[in-house]
């Protein structure tokens, strides 16, 4: 009964950071979510993402982990978020590697990140994917279509020009705002 969250005023979100380039997006999302007192975050970081944090940032992985309320090893298939009985409001995978995308759409729940997405899908919870690959091949596109057919929300981290945001930070904030909107959250940049 501890797992059920239906009466709670707290939003529970699972955040997955996979091994695609762009792990900074996941870090920034966690920073924003940390500022909300009514959001509980559950974090899974893949081994590839840990490598990318070392390659792409100067952050120590401990700095990333401390932003989440709970963090889990990717091989921990006994974690709370691996069970449909543990109620969440959904999941964001940012960035989402093509390997992770393929695992999700083909039900290959070999690790906690994939299992958590699988649970959210089977329980009809929102799954937001932020795929990071360029150019996209036919297999990538087919997998993205399949993800959309499974009701995943696809938010590619694309450059936008209509809002005159020209710095990288402004572009990142715009993408994060789009992610947060999926959960009814406003982000004041």
Q: Model-derived features: where do they sit?
A:
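Short, Lys/Arg-enriched N-terminal segments with co-localized hydrophobic residues
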Residues: 1-10
